[in-house]
Amino acid sequence: CHGFRNDSKVKLRGEGPAVMQLQSGNTYRFRPDGSAIEPVTWGQVNPFGMCFDRWGDAYTADCHSKPITHLVRGGYYESFGKPHDGLGFAPPMTAHDHDSTGIAGVAVYDAAQYPAEYRDCFYVGNVITNVVHRDVPQWRGSSPWISAPVDFVSCPDPWFHPVDIQLGPDGALYL
């Protein structure tokens, strides 16, 4: 993920002067040895956190647009003043903004340690409201849809700001 107003140039490893221009909001994939980089999606504003579900589908948490985005390879997503490719923007997976623009981190829970109702849900950190939201997807064909988030963890302590969420190898969610 590449954040808002962070246009960068990346030199690829190997022979020759191969340089790739990274544009803000887009997502990219790299070869482990640094010899190749390619765009996966275009748009978004400030993706801040990424996860993959059990089927290998990618999701991002994005500040200032949709809290969770299902990344469809080659898709264009709404951003500040950026056009789509002529076919329109990829479909959103929620109309709810989670009550802020400070979304940071997303994890999908696909382990077996939590009760069934908490599995296959998305967990999103909200650093403005001091909440970790649990987003329960309803599937519309192969596309997930989130009606509204449910508070999973909330804290009145002003120092509690969930900036990242990860699923650990032990099946626990780490904030």
What are the roles of these predicted feature ranges?
Residues 1-175:
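Beta-propeller domains with acidic blade repeats across secreted/periplasmic ectodomains
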